[in-house]
Amino acid sequence: MAHVTDFKEAGFNTLLEELEWRGLISQSTDRDRLAEALNGEPITYYCGFDPTAASLHIGNLVQLINMRHLQLAGHHPIALVGGATGLIGDPRQSGERTLNPKDVVAGWADRLKNQIGGILDTEGANAVRFVSNYDWTASMTVIDFLRDVGKNFRLGTMLAKDTVARRLNSEEGISFTEFSYQVLQGNDFLHLFDEYHCTLELGGSDQWGNLTSGLDLIHKVRGVDVNVFTSPIITDASGKKFGKSEGNAVWLDATMLSPYKFYQFWINRPDVEMESLLKAFTFLPKAEIERLVEESKTNPGKREAQKTLAWEVTSFVHGEAATQAAIDASGALFGRGGNLEDIDEETLESVLDGFKVVDENGEHVFPVSKPGDRVIDAAQAAGLFKSASEARRAIKSGGVYLNNNRIEDEEQVLAEADFLAGRFALIRRGKKALGAVENR
């Protein structure tokens, strides 16, 4: 299983010291006040997740990891699934969000709760509490909202928020709906403070303006100084944000991104990212991370850091069994141990997805082969050879494999049993060139 340790086991004196070392804090309220809150008696904290898609992604995973660190230290988590704010959407850096139907948002909210519940403890003294801001927002009239909440917000301060200011200066501008989002989020913090004495909110660094709205509101109407902190935004090698709206999301839901592909995402990260990713996305002790980083520098070909990272994050999100299945599938694919026949159909399809070809309609599909078709024809269809004669030469030299079994006969045909899960036949040329055909 993934290593999940509290700050003392990880080699740190305080929780804040660990979070800072791991690069999990970008901005915060007064550091001494935050440190005192985290190091004292258990507090209640919250993080909001808007159901603007059917799954969370790795940008949200950073927040869940922060929540887990605090939970392990004995603090009490609240996961707010934004049944109300999810109907509106927080302002993006550019472009208005699409407003989704209420029933769709409600369905997504249920899925997000299940994902969060698979990562945070849902039982015990400090089990995660789930709330929806729809419960206290939906019944509020416009008059109540403007009188009781809106009057506490100054327009100048709201207009100065980074995202709002940027959108105001853009061609598309910003709607009143998205402009009001920060007021709703501020009211959420106030409600949770009143209801559960919640004194800390977590979020991504792009949420800083929304987080401070609640901070200022509580100070103004309750006279109490609470805390917020943000984590950095995760970017890819080109500096672009990993997220739903960027089109390259790494989803946490196994039905939207298989555990195999999730595992492959992490194991294929470059050496230069190992230190930051091991710190941020694993709970490994400081000494072990330092050892792995040094190993990646002195013996990069071993890829121990990448393998450890992929195991830790995938098992944290999807569990040990799914992670081991992903590893076994990868090994079986290239004939390095494990049996192709043992891979379930869903994992198999995910593993082979990269071997689709573009058909005459521009669609990515598996090339079709039927029982009785020659292996050399299937290999050509899979894009491994340009001609039958080229395929025959490769077979003669012992370099063609069907489901990891070497082909000896140039005229061998596919049998019903050659289609794994009744659907796929895997053909390999040499050690690394792979292709797949589908019986359909």
UniProtKB/Swiss-Prot annotation:
This is Tyrosine--tRNA ligase. Keywords: Aminoacyl-tRNA synthetase, ATP-binding, Cytoplasm, Ligase, Nucleotide-binding, Protein biosynthesis, RNA-binding. Homodimer. Residues 373-439 form the S4 RNA-binding domain. InterPro entries: aa-tRNA-synth_I_CS, aa-tRNA-synth_Ic, Rossmann-like_a/b/a_fold, S4_RNA-bd_sf, SYY-like_C, Tyr-tRNA-ligase, Tyr-tRNA-ligase_bac-type, Tyr-tRNA-ligase_bac_1. Belongs to the class-I aminoacyl-tRNA synthetase family. TyrS type 1 subfamily. It comes from Bifidobacterium longum (strain DJO10A). A motif ('HIGH' region) lies at residues 51-60. GO terms for biological process: tyrosyl-tRNA aminoacylation. The gene is tyrS. Gene3D superfamilies: HUPs, RNA-binding S4 domain, Tyrosyl-Transfer RNA Synthetase. It holds the Pfam family SYY_C-terminal. It is found in: Cytoplasm. GO terms for molecular function: ATP binding; RNA binding; tyrosine-tRNA ligase activity. Catalyzes the attachment of tyrosine to tRNA(Tyr) in a two-step reaction: tyrosine is first activated by ATP to form Tyr-AMP and then transferred to the acceptor end of tRNA(Tyr).
